[in-house]
């Protein structure tokens, strides 16, 4: 739900915020490690689309941590940027300013920035916001391919779509409740979304909708 703490939790995992209590631990293949490499796609509405930067420069900025101070990017790094832009389906738009992009093009640009460094984990904060359903299907197909190379943590309010495209879910609403698969009941959803849920079926596609309910005054 809104205000449940999802984005805050992601920023703590990324090291952008410090936890007020407790600590963050990372594990790789069952063993605790000091850190892991991560890519991050922030919420769409946090991006300043008037900032004078091109598609190429945005994706290239994803390699900043791999570049020595006062040194130029290497040929191999520029090759990686071009490869990532092609993978995102953005060829021909390399020099276009982000303010001239459609919602889907901007999301793919930001996703390219998150992926160009070959991270072990990619965190996507509501990646399907402001994109149409046609591109949403392409986005999830692309994420399925990316998931073969790294882990993906995806934040979304769209429970109906999410359950068709993920392997496990966690509900964050003040506290975190992890569910190891996507076979969840209406009762589980109601308990965590704090409103009535009805499960419907249509062919092989599951749909989840809200029942009629009254808001408290």
Question: Which positions does each model-derived feature cover?
Answer:
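Conserved ABC transporter NBD signature motif
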Residues: 22-38
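ABC ATPase nucleotide-binding domains
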Residues: 183-217
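H-loop (His-switch) and adjacent beta-strand-loop-beta switch element
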Residues: 167-182, 200
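Helix-to-loop junction immediately C-terminal to a conserved catalytic motif
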Residues: 14
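Conserved ABC ATPase "signature" region
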Residues: 75-93
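Catalytic Walker B motif of ABC-type/P-loop ATPase nucleotide-binding domains
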Residues: 122-126
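Conserved ABC ATPase signature
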Residues: 97-101, 105
């Amino acid at each position: 739900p809104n205000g449940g703490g999802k984005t805050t939790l992601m920023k703590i995992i990324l090291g952008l915020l410090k936890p007020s209590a407790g600590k963050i631990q990372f594990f790789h293949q069952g063993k605790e490690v000091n850190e892991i490499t991560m890519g991050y796609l922030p919420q769409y509405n946090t991006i300043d689309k008037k900032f004078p930067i091109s598609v190429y420069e945005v994706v290239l900025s994803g390699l900043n941590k791999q570049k020595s101070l006062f040194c130029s990017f290497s040929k191999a790094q520029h090759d990686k940027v071009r490869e990532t832009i092609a993978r995102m389906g953005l060829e021909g738009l390399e020099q276009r300013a982000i303010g001239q992009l459609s919602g889907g093009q901007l999301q793919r640009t930001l996703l390219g920035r998150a992926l160009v460094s070959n991270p072990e984990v990619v965190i996507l904060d509501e990646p399907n916001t402001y994109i149409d359903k046609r591109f949403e299907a392409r986005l999830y197909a692309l994420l399925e391919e990316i998931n073969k190379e790294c882990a993906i943590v995806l934040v979304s309010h769209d429970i109906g779509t999410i359950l068709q495209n993920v392997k496990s879910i966690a509900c964050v609403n003040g506290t975190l409740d992890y569910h190891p698969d996507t076979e969840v009941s209406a009762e589980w959803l109601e308990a965590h979304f704090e409103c009535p849920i009805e499960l419907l079926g249509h062919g092989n596609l599951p749909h989840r909708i809200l029942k009629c309910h009254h808001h408290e005054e």
